[in-house]
């Protein structure tokens, strides 16, 4: 697998030497975030490859995270591109920059957005087809093991889940709320349940390797009410309500200056969008193979030509098709 990756990159570098000269006038240096989680790193590697080999750019990856990326944009106007920006985690800082015209959103880089919710294993629904909603679970909590697997302390979902548990009166219904100590133990609890085909009920999100590997069914908590959900995101509220998790907008944004300077790259990045199920599959493969983000990106580029070829312009498509046969 690693040899395949290096062979492709090696072949690409030869073409890139010629194409970068031809494109030097049209694409210069580009900086893009390399966030500290797997899905964003794959997106960055795919975008980097397309920009370098298709458009002749010189791409710099900037190690980052949501809050630091937004702060850097506000203070320095860098990096040029921020991808997999979870809008519900940016607070007012990003919206102020957008209103001021300093940054522009180009694309929903994950479609239909980040997914959050309460899940049960598919095998449990096959065994108990009446389990279609959280209301069904609370009517007979023993079917799911009488336990709700909650987020660790410090996570935003922990606050929302705690408020939902109060609003739904879960403890009174006979449901234990088990607060995991880490994301690792939460993920392990799903793996252990699947191995033994045991009941499991709890919170999870995507795109993640877990949802890519294990077939889970998202149960309806209720209608989506954005005001109720926003209120549930606050600690120690007196009036928690019931609302399902709305899809989380996950964006690619650029500085206004970069969009003006590199319109062709801005157009490319406006089209780069990964289906959440596709990303789940890539993340599961990456974990199983102990692969790097670069290797996962190459897998995507080799297997999803019908997708990425629609993102690039005709000239870039010709160059990339010569590399990724």
What is each stretch, according to the model?
Residues 71-73, 79-83, 154-234:
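Ligand-binding pocket segment of bilobal, Venus flytrap-like solute-binding proteins
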Residues 22-32, 139-146, 309-311, 325:
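Immediate post-signal peptide segment of exported/extracytoplasmic ligand-binding proteins
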Residues 208-273:
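C-terminal lobe and pocket-closing loops
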Residues 25-39, 57-62, 145-149, 269:
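Short, well-ordered beta-strand elements
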Residues 102-152:
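A conserved helix-loop-strand patch within extracytoplasmic ligand-binding domains
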Residues 116-126, 249-261, 284-285:
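A bilobed periplasmic-binding-protein/Venus flytrap-type ligand-binding module shared by bacterial periplasmic
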Residues 28, 39, 164-173, 180-197, ...:
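An extracytoplasmic/periplasmic, membrane-proximal ligand-sensing/linker region
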Residues 39-57:
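Short, polar/charged alpha-helical segment
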């Amino acid at each position: 697998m690693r040899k395949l990756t290096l062979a492709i990159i090696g072949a690409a570098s030869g073409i890139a030497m010629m194409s970068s000269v031809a494109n030097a006038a049209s694409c210069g240096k580009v900086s893009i975030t390399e966030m500290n989680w797997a899905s964003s790193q794959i997106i960055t590697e795919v975008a980097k490859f397309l920009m370098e080999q298709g458009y002749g750019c010189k791409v710099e990856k900037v190690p980052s995270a949501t809050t630091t990326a937004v702060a850097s944009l506000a203070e320095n106007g860098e990096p040029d591109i921020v991808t997999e920006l979870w809008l519900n985690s940016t607070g007012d800082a990003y919206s102020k920059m957008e209103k001021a015209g300093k940054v522009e959103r180009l694309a929903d880089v994950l479609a239909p957005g980040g997914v959050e919710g309460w899940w049960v294993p598919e095998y449990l629904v096959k065994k108990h087809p009446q389990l279609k909603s959280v209301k069904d679970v609370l009517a007979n909590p023993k079917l799911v093991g009488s336990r709700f697997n909650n987020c660790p302390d410090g996570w935003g979902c922990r606050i929302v889940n705690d408020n939902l548990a109060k609003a739904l009166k879960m403890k009174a219904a006979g449901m234990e709320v088990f607060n995991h100590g880490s994301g690792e133990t939460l993920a392990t609890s799903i793996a252990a349940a699947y191995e033994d085909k045991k009941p499991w009920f709890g919170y999870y999100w995507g795109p993640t390797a877990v949802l890519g590997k294990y077939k889970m069914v998202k149960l309806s908590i209720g209608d989506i009410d954005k005001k109720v959900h926003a209120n549930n995101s606050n600690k120690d509220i007196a009036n928690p309500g019931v609302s399902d998790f709305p899809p989380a907008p996950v964006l690619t944004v650029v500085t206004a200056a970069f969009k003006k300077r590199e319109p062709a790259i801005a157009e490319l990045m406006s089209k780069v969008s990964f289906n959440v199920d596709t990303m789940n599959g890539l993340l599961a493969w990456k974990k199983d193979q102990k692969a790097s983000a670069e290797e996962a990106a190459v897998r995507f580029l080799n297997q999803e030509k019908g997708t990425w070829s629609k993102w690039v312009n005709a000239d870039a498509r010709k160059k990339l098709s010569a590399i990724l046969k």
